[in-house]
C-alpha cells in the first residue's frame, strides 16, 4: 500500500493530508509535526477567531494581495479557490460569515471551530497524526521512493512526501531541501508593525485614520488603508500591507528607513491645496482647529496643525500662503523615521522559502526530486493580512495532496 508523508501539521499540511486520503483512499497518509501541538498558527489567526479566507470582492489584481507568488496562485485558483474553501468548510458543518471588509470567519468567531474541523476530518478519513517528529534529511531512492530521517533517528520510506512546514526565519532550516538541489530564497519577515519614536506622535495612541497612503521615499513601495497609531508606532492595514510589499527592501535597510504619510490619501498636492482653500473660503471666521478634513479625527488634526507650526486658534481667513504651503506639505508628505519592527498579533509570516523555479507549477512537485511536493508558506509565496495567507495554504494543500503521479514539464 503506498505511503504518503506530510511534514508539518499546520493548515496546509492538514488540508494536503485530508485531500490526499480522500483522493487516494487506499494510501496510508501520516502527518509528522515537530512540536507537540498541531494547527498552532490556525488557532491564533485573526486574533483567535481564524480569518480563514477572503471573499476577494475588493481584489482587482492578485498581485495586490500576493506580493510574491501571485501568478502561481492565479493558476492554482483554477483548481481550488476561495469559493471552494467556503464550500468545503460549510460542507463539513462549519458555518462561515463574511464581514463588511470581506474577511471570512467561522460563524462561531472561534479558531477552534476550524482546527477541530480539520482534526476531525483527518481522523475520520484515516489520516495518522504524529507529533514530536522533526525531519532532518530526505534521501531519494532508486525506485523513486523517498527515505525520511527524523532527529530521533527514526527512518521511514514513503512513495510521496509533502513538505508543509510553514515559513522559517532562517534559511538553514531548509538546508535539507537545498542539499537536494532546491533554490532557497532567503526568508525575511513580511507582516509587521513599524516603530516610531516621536513622543508627540505616539501620544496619538489609539487613533485610526482611514484611508491614508503610506510610501517609502525614493522607492515605488506604497500602500493604502487604515492607519492605527499605537504606543509603539504604527499598525493597521496600511502599515501591514507596506511591510509585505517592501519586505526585502526594509530588511536590507535593517528596519531603519523613512515612511511618508499622506493623511488624505490624495496623491495630488494641488488637489489638497484646493480643498483647503475651499474650507477657508467657506469658513473664513472659523478657527483652524474647528474645521478639518472629514477623515481626520480632532486629535490627529490638532497634532498636524502643530507639526505644521500653525496656531490652531487662528481663523482660516488668516492662514496665508506660507501657512497653506506648510499644511499641504504636512498633509501629503509627512515624513517619519522608522526605527524598528514589531509583530502583528503574534502571527509570523515570511517571504522567501523554496523558489518557485524549483517546482512544477501545475502540481507543486519538485523538479529535482520526483514525488516530493510542497504546500503552504514553505514556498516563496506570501500575502498581506486579510485571510489571504490561509487561502494560499488551502489552495496549495489541496493541489499537493490530490496530485499523486509525477508532474509533466508543461508548466509554462
Walk through the language-model features, giving the residues of each:
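Predominantly flavin-linked oxidoreductase catalytic cores and closely associated redox partners
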Residues: 112-113, 117-297
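Short beta-strand to alpha-helix junction loop
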Residues: 73-81, 100-120, 164, 168-172, ...
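Glycine-rich FAD pyrophosphate-binding loop
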Residues: 5, 21-47
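N-terminal glycine-rich dinucleotide-binding loop that anchors FAD/FMN and/or NAD(P) in oxidoreductases
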Residues: 43-73
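A conserved FAD-binding loop/helix module that cradles the flavin
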Residues: 164-180, 380-409
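Redox-cofactor binding/interface segments in oxidoreductases and associated redox assembly factors
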Residues: 7, 44, 163-167, 374
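Residue-level recognition of phosphate/Mg2+-coordinating polar/acidic sites
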Residues: 23, 37, 58-61, 78, ...
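Beta1/beta-strand and adjacent pyrophosphate-binding region of the FAD-binding site
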Residues: 1-12
Amino acid at each position: 500500500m503506498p505511503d504518503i508523508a506530510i511534514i508539518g501539521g499546520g493548515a496546509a499540511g492538514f488540508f494536503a493530508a485530508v485531500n490526499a486520503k480522500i483522493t487516494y483512499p487506499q494510501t496510508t497518509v501520516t502527518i509528522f509535526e515537530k512540536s507537540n501541538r498541531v494547527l498552532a498558527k490556525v488557532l491564533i489567526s485573526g486574533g483567535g477567531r481564524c480569518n480563514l479566507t477572503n471573499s476577494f470582492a475588493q481584489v482587482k489584481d492578485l498581485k495586490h494581495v500576493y506580493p510574491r507568488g501571485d501568478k502561481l496562485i492565479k493558476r492554482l485558483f483554477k483548481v481550488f479557490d476561495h469559493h471552494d474553501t467556503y464550500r468545503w468548510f460549510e460542507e463539513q458543518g462549519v458555518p462561515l460569515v463574511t464581514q463588511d471588509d470581506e474577511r471570512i470567519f467561522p460563524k462561531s468567531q472561534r479558531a477552534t471551530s476550524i482546527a477541530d474541523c480539520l482534526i476531525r476530518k483527518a481522523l475520520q478519513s484515516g489520516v495518522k497524526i504524529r507529533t514530536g517528529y522533526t525531519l532532518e534529511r530526505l534521501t531519494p531512492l532508486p525506485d523513486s521512493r523517498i527515505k525520511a530521517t527524523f532527529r530521533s533517528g527514526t527512518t521511514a520510506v514513503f512513495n510521496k512526501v509533502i513538505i508543509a512546514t510553514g515559513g522559517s526565519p532562517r534559511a538553514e532550516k531548509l538546508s535539507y531541501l537545498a542539499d537536494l538541489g532546491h533554490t532557497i530564497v532567503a526568508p525575511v519577515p513580511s507582516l509587521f508593525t513599524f516603530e516610531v519614536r516621536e513622543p508627540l506622535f505616539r501620544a496619538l495612541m489609539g487613533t485610526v485614520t482611514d484611508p491614508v497612503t503610506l510610501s517609502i521615499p525614493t522607492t515605488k513601495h506604497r500602500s493604502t488603508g487604515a492607519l492605527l497609531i499605537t504606543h509603539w508606532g504604527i499598525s493597521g492595514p496600511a502599515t501591514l500591507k507596506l511591510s509585505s510589499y517592501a519586505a526585502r527592501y526594509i530588511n536590507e535597510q535593517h528596519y531603519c528607513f523613512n515612511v511618508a504619510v499622506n493623511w488624505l490619501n490624495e496623491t495630488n498636492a494641488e488637489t489638497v491645496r484646493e480643498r483647503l482653500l475651499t474650507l477657508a473660503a467657506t469658513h473664513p471666521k472659523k478657527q483652524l482647529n474647528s474645521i478639518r478634513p472629514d477623515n481626520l479625527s480632532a486629535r490627529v488634526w490638532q497634532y498636524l496643525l502643530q507639526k505644521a507650526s500653525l496656531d490652531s486658534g487662528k481663523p482660516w481667513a488668516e492662514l496665508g500662503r506660507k501657512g497653506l504651503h506648510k499644511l499641504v506639505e504636512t498633509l501629503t508628505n509627512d515624513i517619519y523615521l522608522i526605527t524598528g519592527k514589531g509583530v502583528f498579533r503574534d502571527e509570523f509570516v515570511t517571504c522567501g522559502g523554496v523558489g518557485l523555479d524549483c517546482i512544477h507549477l501545475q502540481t507543486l512537485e519538485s523538479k529535482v526530486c520526483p514525488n516530493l511536493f510542497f504546500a503552504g508558506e514553505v514556498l516563496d509565496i506570501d500575502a498581506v493580512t486579510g485571510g489571504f495567507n490561509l487561502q494560499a495554504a488551502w489552495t496549495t494543500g489541496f493541489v499537493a495532496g490530490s496530485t499523486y503521479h509525477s508532474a509533466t514539464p508543461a508548466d509554462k
